Amino acid sequence: MTGNMHYTFPMLTNQAPFDDVNVRKALKYGLNRQEMVDKILQGHGMVGNDHPIGPANQYLATDIPQIEFDADKAKFHMKAAGLTELNVDLSASDAAFNGAVDASQLYQASAKNAGININVVQEPADGYWSNVWLKKGWCACYWSGRATEDWMFSTAYESGVPWNDTHWDNARFQELLLTARAELDSNKRRAQYAEMQMLLSQEGGTIIPMFANTVDAASTKLAHGPDIGNIWQMDSSRLTERWWFA
């Protein structure tokens, strides 16, 4: 089943050219997401839409328009940014996630059809999280996801937090983060989280091409209840509580 683990390509939005929202949008439209799910995850996952809220979250917004590969839209946004072509480095290592280098090369191939030239820089696995993530302008990354929307947003998207790996700072998003956290009406909170997901999808600095399935194997000697959690691996990390020897 598909959980909240997702693979990402965060851009530092306080650095050129990623500080231009049109450059970010061009890169969003330059990616064939389904191809990445098919070839990197072998079909064991689902396409992402550039926000981190997954199918195991309560307030996943399912009505946000899906971003798909569109060379014309990518070129439109490059032109809006004053560019006829775009040349960018993408740092990657399989330390980021299994298949990250291959995923980056797939991205490179699809983006080329939109006039975007991605130079894939294969970084050493040793020291990747110290020397590349949060340091290089654009890189490969992954997140295991979080059990609640507020937890996910507060960890990686709140302004000023250490793990905001895009340095994206949107005033409306930050306002909604605080109001949704305090909102007791579930319908109002759902609407607030939906707007936050839309803002990230359309303007944010993270490309999120795919969410991964949780694939577990178990002996027939083990038994479990009717449902299996998909927030994290191993029955949402509660295998020792909810499984038993048959």
Predicted features along the sequence, with ranges:
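Short, solvent-exposed loop/beta-turn-alpha elements that line the ligand-binding surface or hinge
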Residues: 1, 10-20, 54-73, 130-135, ...
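Periplasmic-binding protein-like
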Residues: 2-3, 14, 18-57, 99-103, ...
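Periplasmic binding protein-like
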Residues: 90, 103, 108-160, 192-193
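Structural transition elements
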Residues: 47-80, 96-102
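Structural recognition of the beta-strand scaffold that forms the well-ordered cores
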Residues: 1, 7-10, 29-30, 37-38, ...
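Bilobed periplasmic-binding protein-like "clamshell/Venus-flytrap" ligand-binding domains
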Residues: 38, 81-98, 139-144, 184-220
